[in-house]
């Protein structure tokens, strides 16, 4: 059993061509491990949310509905360069019904307004629909990790401050360790940025 740990960064079969977890098996395995809650954060979609919620209710586990959204490097309307086709990852988790409504709106607008290779949101939308949401900095494909991998520590501090302006105390820096060299390289810098900005840390697994 794993007590005191909750998976907050989890992909299912609805992360198409990426996730291998089946929702039923995912929830039942979490229960077997003695976990009281589990999140679902598929890439850019919320297709599995209802099945996930119902399965969690059936198994007596708290369902944390979320999404790993794609954030446009510039704005969601910029669709002309290769960089626009490489959006940053960002994990959003619903705190309450308002958060669920706002996340649903963000995911919808990612498709209807921001789609360019991927459904993309931008900072303007995040500011508009931030209420009721918890934000995690995501994996090595997140903007914070990419900034640190580029060696831009000062820019990383500025970035975290910008996200804290949007999400306040509901913004967390993710720490992951899967034996990937890039993760190990930026880990001390993530800790430094967290200390310098007073940002809380959260340990996650990028579960697929």
Predicted regions and their residues:
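Phosphodiester-processing cores and adjacent nucleic acid-binding clamps
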Residues: 1-208
């Amino acid at each position: 059993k794993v007590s005191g740990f909750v998976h907050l960064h989890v992909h299912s079969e609805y992360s198409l061509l990426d996730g291998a977890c089946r929702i039923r098996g995912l929830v039942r395995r979490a229960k077997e491990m003695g976990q009281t809650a589990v999140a679902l954060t598929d890439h850019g979609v919320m297709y599995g949310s209802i099945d996930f919620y119902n399965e969690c209710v059936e198994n007596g586990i708290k369902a944390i509905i979320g999404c790993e959204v794609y954030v446009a490097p510039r704005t969601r309307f910029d669709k002309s360069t290769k960089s626009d086709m490489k959006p940053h990852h960002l994990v959003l988790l619903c705190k309450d019904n308002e958060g669920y409504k706002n996340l649903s709106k963000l995911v919808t607008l990612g498709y209807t307004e921001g789609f360019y290779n991927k459904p993309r949101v931008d900072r303007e939308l995040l500011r508009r629909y931030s209420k009721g949401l918890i934000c995690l900095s995501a994996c090595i494909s997140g903007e914070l990790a990419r900034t640190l991998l580029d060696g831009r520590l000062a820019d990383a501090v500025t970035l975290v401050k910008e996200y804290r302006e949007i999400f306040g105390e509901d913004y967390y820096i993710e720490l992951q360790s899967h034996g990937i060299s890039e993760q190990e390289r930026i880990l001390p810098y993530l800790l430094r940025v967290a200390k310098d900005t007073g940002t809380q840390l959260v340990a996650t697994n990028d579960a697929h």
